[in-house]
Amino acid sequence: MKIFGKEKEDKPVKEESLIDYKYSEDRILKELAEYINSTYNQHYSQNKFQATEFILDSGHGTGFTIGNILKYAQRYGKKGSREDARKDLLKVIHYGIIALHNHDKEKI
């Protein structure tokens, strides 16, 4: 099992990129993976289930994730430091990933 750049046993996975990214996508994707991994160590994820799981399972995932994307996008640059604004963008992307996961699981 790979966890973005590493196998589960913490053996490095060889990452070779022949693409000359113009917008630092490779660096940003690595940072995004580190951010997402860090959210799994936060206090609200220490329980057996996260609140997000209940929301998705109850059929409210699309509204929840899109609502959070809008919330953090509108908050961008208006709260805290420049680094706080950057974290808001990471949250937008993370909720976008959860929205994609939910979209793929829905059977509409």
What are these regions (language model features)?
Residues 1-108:
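Intrinsically disordered, low-complexity regulatory regions
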